[in-house]
Amino acid sequence: MSAIIEAKKQLVDEIAEVLSNSVSTVIVDYRGLTVAEVTDLRSQLREAGVEYKVYKNTMVRRAAEKAGIEGLDEFLTGPTAIATSSEDAVAAAKVISGFAKDHEALEIKSGVMEGNVITAEEVKTVGSLPSHDGLVSMLLSVLQAPVRNFAYAVKAIGEQKEESAE
């Protein structure tokens, strides 16, 4: 019996470490999905660099407590799978939200962003945001626009002066 308890403690430590190291976590109820659909979801998540695992609710509850995450208890009922991303804060929410639109059986329960519990609606909102790279490119284009417009204005003035000099 002691070996079983040690294995459970080790699993709780592993889950707590995953929760602590992830920048975003999405908790879903996968009930009603076929094996093919779950396999498809797993492959999409893997491509996005997101880890997807099914854990017992009691183990997740203890791990969340150990990781200092409060407020998850109410969402840990029924079959629960957890998608975590340690790199991109938007990746897990984006893939899960997109998959949930096409497959109504996948229910988003809640999520955790940087240690704070968020609702299913907030997960969907985060999922609709562009990725980090997309946001950076948007910012760069906004910063580049005034310089580009100034260059066009200088070029137009130069062309205008050339025409008047002729």
Swiss-Prot record:
Swiss-Prot/TrEMBL keywords: Ribonucleoprotein, Ribosomal protein, RNA-binding, rRNA-binding
InterPro entries in alphabetical order: Ribosomal_uL10 (IPR001790), Ribosomal_uL10-like_sf (IPR043141), Ribosomal_uL10_bac (IPR022973), Ribosomal_uL10_bac_type (IPR047865), Ribosomal_uL10_CS_bac (IPR002363)
Gene Ontology BP annotations: translation
MF GO annotations: large ribosomal subunit rRNA binding; structural constituent of ribosome
GO cellular component, one term: large ribosomal subunit
Source organism superkingdom: Bacteria
Main function: Forms part of the ribosomal stalk, playing a central role in the interaction of the ribosome with GTP-bound translation factors.
HAMAP family on file: Ribosomal_uL10
Family membership noted in the UniProt record: Belongs to the universal ribosomal protein uL10 family.
Subunit structure: Part of the ribosomal stalk of the 50S ribosomal subunit. The N-terminus interacts with L11 and the large rRNA to form the base of the stalk. The C-terminus forms an elongated spine to which L12 dimers bind in a sequential fashion forming a multimeric L10(L12)X complex.
Full protein name: Large ribosomal subunit protein uL10
Gene field: rplJ
